[in-house]
Amino acid sequence: MENYQQTQEQKPSGSPNINIKFDNNKEAITQQDKAKQFNKQFVNVVKHATKKSNRKIDKTTKALTATPMKITNIQTYEAIKNTINKDSTGPDNLNIRHLKHLGPIAIQYLTDTLNLALSTNCIPQIWKLAKIIPIPKPNKDPNLGTSYRPISLLSPIAKTMEKVLIPHITSNITPVRYQHGFKTQHSTSTALHHLTNQITTGFNQKQPADRTIVVSLDLSKAFDTVNIHNLIQKLQQTNVTNLIKKFVANYIKGRKGYTLYQGAQSKQQQFKTGVPQGGVLSPTLFKLYTSDLPAPPQNVSITTYADDMNPSASHANYRIAQNNLQPYLEDIFKWTQKNELILNPDKSTATLFTPHQAEFNTILDLTINNTIIPTVKTPKILGLTLDPHLTFKDHVNKTKEKADKNIKILKALNGTTWGKQKQTLIATYKATVQSGQS
């Protein structure tokens, strides 16, 4: 989540001389006030009774009998080595590069620290603190607070601990068949292959062939709205060791964050919901949180990647496919309500994939909580723009347009003295043209 070029405190995260209006109609003028309002926006995503929730978590884990477990020097070293280098620092003013310079003796001390925190369940407060940097969203009004997204920076030592624990958690969670996120030998590519294969298989049926309806569901700020007590209850039902259950429960409750904006720093506030922003363990915890998503009924499928959920149905008559899909959408909505996730029908989309040109302009009649889901012809799912006939023309054209624009930048660089260096051009190509095609 971090990007050094974006998150250096010395570099501006927006124009310093503009007033910013926030959702509470508060217009922030000073840098200090902007930092304060940003922190409220990023930390207080959902309002819950934090103290009551924390007491529930304590009660849930208090009776657990923990079996001792030891983290080894090799596990600590491998966790550090396999972390991508970042220059941005956490709230402890450390980054992963600092840890990569540790020698054997220092690694031993660090491992002892991790083991002490795990065995005693005493977690340093700095491990539960997030430093948040507001980053302007592209092509958005910089005068609105909602036009900024948070980059959350954590202690690299805390993230090392998270990384050490991940294998112990994932190996004890039953994998969900249709979940492609954060799963061995699965990725966005396998998710997209599963979805597009369903569509093309339908097209290849004997006439009149199968149409496929795909709904792309929008979960608003899904990672940030997770109910922590509900998450711990789901963790309790797994085969994860009690020692790790107790540690994770303590680690994710009572977390705090502060925001830095243009050199101004807000006060710390407590996160009331959500898995740790910027944490490497968070995707695994979210996968656990959504593991009890209702299974699709017969004639309906679903493909998920983290919080991207795409239920679908195929049939020679699109109206029958639509009727098959509607009850499942209602089941998913009820599940999101129970789990306190926010399903937004207005930002969700429904698309009819059909081999028949006459049906390209069909408006579907699917709803979530009695709200019509917008019908779109070219949805963007997991970075891939699809079209009703699955020709990928829209995706290819948009990718080519973006690549052409970046190639012009390369040509301009090649005309400068310093830009003629081969390595400079290759690095720029990978960062612009190649990355835009992945």
Residue spans of the language-model regions?
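Catalytic palm subdomain of template-directed nucleic-acid polymerases
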Residues: 100, 219-238, 310-333, 391
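Conserved pre-catalytic core of RNA-dependent polymerases
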Residues: 42, 68-276
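Active-site palm subdomain of RNA-directed nucleic acid polymerases
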Residues: 165-180, 204-207, 283-313
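Short, conserved secondary-structure transition motifs
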Residues: 6-12, 188, 254-258, 351-360
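Catalytic palm active-site di-aspartate
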Residues: 90, 129-132, 149, 179, ...
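Basic/polar low-complexity segments
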Residues: 1-73
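Short, conserved micro-motifs composed of acidic
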Residues: 66, 263-264, 327, 342-377
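Basic, alpha-helical interaction scaffolds
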Residues: 298, 371-438
